[in-house]
Structure formats: structure tokens, C-alpha cells
Amino acid sequence: MNPNLLEKDLRGKETTNGSIRYKEANNFRSLPNSHTAACKTSLNNPSISRNHPHNKSASVLESEDEHGNERGENEKSLRMRGKSGINTKVCSRGHWRPTEDAKLKELVAQFGPQNWNLISNHLLGRSGKSCRLRWFNQLDPRINKRAFTEEEEFRLLAAHRAYGNKWALISRLFPGRTDNAVKNHWHVIMARRTRESQRQRQQPPPTLSRDAEMTVSSSCRYNQGKFINEEDDDDDVSAVSTCTTELSLTPPSSAYQPRFFNYDSTLASGKDGQCVQRAEVNGIYGKKMDHQNHHTISVSERKVEMKMRSGYYYFDFLGVGAS
């Protein structure tokens, strides 16, 4: 082969008789118009070209991004873990168990009540702050756990009026009491007072009810110049008259004014020669009760009425009758 015919261009491609021998240029010149349009749209829309099934570079970039995210998450998780490989950020927020309290007492006795981060490393699931609060509020042997006395409650209310909600400052006035205990007991006192005030509001006033009714009745018989109780002599039929006193107290429906009692007795004819003595009551309701007025009273009954009103009774020893 003639060495003059073989030449190299600036790109390192071999040429024969001045013609370029790489097919890419010829193929690019012979591309149809549809393919060139698709290339232009792919350049304008990078998302379409990236998601094209024949685009291998896009898939490679996506796999690199996924590996990068996983690597970042692993580094973050390792950063959150301590030297022992335990995730110290995950702490239980439930109630303290007796085993945890016993373990905390042992650790405080070993390291002292100040190295709380070191103590929390030996107590799984608890932070340093949680251990400190548990110790100073519940487990410290210097805490006074007895009930508050009346004198302490009085001083607590006075201190709250003076200092407000500064519980740490108020707790210094109560040796052995924590700020949390002082605050909780103040709320207990306020709740107790609220219940007592509500109970007093619900109680009815101490007045007589309008539906109350009191009836007092007494009966006696007047026989031959003396009064005899009906329970003592039920078989005696020679009674001249029988007097029955009824006191009734019923509330009226209208407004009232307080008055004194006024006793007004009348004798009304009853059955079988009985006379009924009724009393009108002007009570706290200030209105006279309805009563029965009987105008047909016999002569003997009128004499008994006159004797009763005059204050003495007529005794017929000779049996001649009243004159």
C-alpha cells in the first residue's frame, strides 16, 4: 500500500484518498428527519431522555443516587449510636418499674448524684434527664413523703400569694419537700375548695318547703264538769260534748309576709253532739287558712264555749243545770 495514500487527520482517524473513514459521521449525515426531531425534543425535555428505556446513563445515575442515599442514612444512624452500638436517642417514656428504680439507686450509690449521662449509659432506655428527675423527685432518701399538715397548707397558700407559681423558690420554705410535690399539693387544695363550693351551691336553703303540711289534732270529751281523754274511757256514752282541736298548716299560692300566730277558736256542731274546735293559723305564710263556720250551735254548746273563753269551767255538783 502506498504510504502517501494513508494519512492521519488531526483527530487520529485514518483517511484514504482524502475521505474520512469513520462511519459515525456518515451515519449522522444520513439520519432521517424524524430521528433528528426526536433528538431535539429529547434535548429540550431532559426528563424524557432520562427515562428513555435505551438510555443506560440515566439508570446508572439513578443507581448511584440510591447508593448515595443509603450511605447517608447509614452514616446518620452510626452518628446517632454511641460507642457501645446502642441507639441512645430511643428512650422509653413509660412509668418507671421497680427493677429500674433499684438499678438507679445502685448507680447513684456508685457514681454519685451528678454523673447522669454516665448513669443513663448503664440504664437502658432512660436518658440522663429522666434519671435526674426520677432521683430528685421520688428516690432521694431526704424527701419528706408524709402528708401535708394544716399548718403547711396555710404557709403554702400564703407563699403562693406572695411568690406566685415560682415553685422552686417556694419549695425552699418547706425542708424535705420538692418543687413538684409543692405544686401538686397546691392544685389538690384548689380542687378541694372548688368541690366544697359546688356542694354548698347544690344544697337547698334551710327554709320550710311550700309543699310541707303539718297537722296536729287532739280530741277530748267533756263529761260532767271535767275533760276526759277518749283513750282512757271509750265505753262512756254519757258525754255531754266532745271537743276536737285541729291545727293545720298549709302553704298558700300567693306572696306572703311574716306574721305571728293568731289563735281563734270556734265551736261548730258535729255528729252525735260533738263540737269541733278549729284554730286559724296566721303562720309564716301570712294568710289565714280556710275554716268552717257553723252558725247552728245549741244552747248547751254555747255555754261550754262561754265557759272555755272566760278561763274557767262550770261544774254542776247539784245537778240543777246551768243558770
Swiss-Prot record:
InterPro entries found in the cross-reference section: Homeodomain-like_sf, Myb_dom, MYB_TF, SANT/Myb
What induces its synthesis?
Answer: Levels follow a circadian cycle with a progressive decrease during the day time (at protein level). Down-regulated by brassinosteroids (BRs) in a dose- and time-dependent manner. Repressed by BES1. Auto-activation of expression. Targeted to 26S proteasomal degradation by the CULLIN3 (CUL3)-based E3 ligases CRL3(BPMs).
Task: Please give the knockout or disruption phenotype noted for this protein.
Answer: Smaller seeds and embryos associated with smaller contracted endothelial cells and reduced cell number in the outer integument layer of the seed coat during the seed development. Increased quiescent center (QC) cell divisions. Early flowering under long-day (LD) associated with FT accumulation.
Q: Report the SUPFAM superfamilies cross-referenced here.
A: Homeodomain-like
Function of the protein:
Acts as a cell-specific local repressor of quiescent center (QC) self-renewal by cell divisions in the primary root. Counteracts brassinosteroid (BR)-mediated cell division in the QC cells. Regulates maternally seed size, especially before the heart stage, promoting both endothelial cells expansion and cell number in the outer integument layer of the seed coat. Modulates the expression of genes involved in cell wall metabolism such as cell division and expansion. Negative regulator of flowering via the repression of FT transcription.
- Quaternary state and interactors: Forms homodimer. Interacts with the dephosphorylated active form of BES1 in the nucleus of quiescent center (QC) cells. Interacts with BPM1, BPM2, BPM3, BPM4, BPM5 and BPM6 at the promoter of FLOWERING LOCUS T (FT).
UniProt name for this protein: Transcription factor MYB56
